[in-house]
Amino acid sequence: FMENGTGKTAWLDGQRSLIDAEKQDVLQWVMVGGEGFLKPAPDGTERLAYHVVRRDCYNVLARGPRGITDVLMSERSRAGSDYYTLLERRTVDGSGYLTIRYKLYVSENSSTLGHEVRLDSLPQYAALAPEHTYSVPFGGLGMTYIRLPMANNVDGSPDGVSVYEGAVQLIHNIYKNEYQLGREF
């Protein structure tokens, strides 16, 4: 525990403020998709920027006893008439070492992945190394995993489900009842 007013305390307070600024977006996307990540990324200063990784932007590739151990994320962007997809794979091995791999693809349309190009093809990805394994055990994916609701009451799988999923049948029944009542009166 740190004393108030130290440099580390001020830095942590700044990070907490940055996370607080993202919490509404995080909560909304996690409720819609059932789960998601809050991902820290260097912003070019001494701070981290935090980004929401929505459920439709990643695939879980493996799980271990303590949660997700392998995930593939995608980020889409457009430059001129080309469509770019950055694939980021984060894998944690059995000893807790985190490896991050990046690949960039370009396509002439938004419906195909296209072919692989160099990471420096787009300026925002030029500083990324194609692969990096941390030299000390990281113990996780380096992101905060958030899941709402905690229990999957739809199919019992380890995947998250939208908080709205359980209400779908109820909403259909309400519409049906309203339709029937509207026809009678």
Where are each of the predicted segments found?
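Structured, mid-chain assembly/scaffold modules that mediate subunit interfaces
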Residues: F1-V136
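Extended, charged amphipathic alpha-helical segments
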Residues: P123-F185
